[in-house]
Structure formats: structure tokens, C-alpha cells
Amino acid sequence: MPARSFPRPASLVPCMALAALAACGTCKPPVPPTVVVPEDLKPPAGETLQRTLWATGVQIYECRAKAGTTGATEWAFLGPEASLADDKGAIVGKHYAGPSWEAGDGSKVVGTVKARVDPPGGTSIPWLLLETRNVGKAQGQFAHVSSVQRVATEGGLPPATPCAAAEIGQKARVDYKAQYVLYAPTF
């Protein structure tokens, strides 16, 4: 009877590594159906698409006394907190209050809302067009971004249950996802 040979554990390591790499091909952020962007959210003439990023994070709200009322409360928006991934799923930056988009290389822009459109279905935060200005490094991934579109939003609305006076100061972190489409001047 011929001797049987079995793979040595050391020879399995490269095979397992290759299998893991092959599986990472499916680790990309989900690509939503083609997004039809309303005319109101189109970037200004003279700007071209730089890149699309996928945000995953939370929209943060705080229970506050409602201005101009006696005893009424509301969930007030504080800001987002999200990671930004590229089309391969690699985290390339973060998004936070300002609203700000900051790349891992230190380049950063802050935005001002120019247009707002309710999303299809109305069950998530609005789609936006924001004009941006550079407040970070002069060079880098986000250094030349001049406009940002927020589209394909999921979730992020304030809690449906009103907050009570006893909850003033408490925060609610509501999951959300969105596509951020970055534009830069055409050179």
C-alpha cells in the first residue's frame, strides 16, 4: 500500500491567505441602484466628478427645550459621525459636524448647504448639495473639493418618539448610510 501524504500546516497558510483575499473581493460597499440626482442637486458648471464615497455612521440628535415654547421638547440635530469608504471598501476618511469631510492625509473641507431635496420614499435624511471650502492641508485627497452631493441616504432621521423634559440633554445616535459624491473645479 503506497504511503499517503497530507499537506503540512505550513503549506496551508498560503492557501488560506489566498482564500481570504478572494473573499475580500466581496467586501466592497454595496452599490445601490443607479441614483438619479435631481436637477436642484447638480454641481455648478465648471466642476467635474472627483470621486464617490460611501458613509456609514450615525446622525446625532439631542433632546432640547423647543425654542419659543413652554415645556415643549424636540430632538435637535447635532451632527454626523461616519466613516468614509472608497469603492474598494477602504476607509479613506471621516465625516463629522461642520459638516466636515476629512481625509486620512489631513486634507479637509467644510460645507454649506446650497440645495435640499426629500429622498425617494421620504424615510431617510434629505439629499443635499453643499458648497465646500478647504480648511485643511493645501494638498491631499479632499484639498480641491468644491462641492459635495449627499444622495442615496438610508436612515438617519430623528427618533420618531418625542423626548420628554426629563430627557433634556440626552443624545440619540441614529444609524445612517449615504453616498457622498465629491466634485472639484475642472482645470
Pin down the residues of each PLM region.
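C-terminal motif of bacterial Sec signal peptides marking the signal peptidase cleavage site
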Residues: 20-26
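Bacterial N-terminal signal peptides that target proteins for export
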Residues: 2-14
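Primary mode marks residue(s) on the alpha4-beta5-alpha5 output face of response regulator receiver
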Residues: 30-62, 67-187
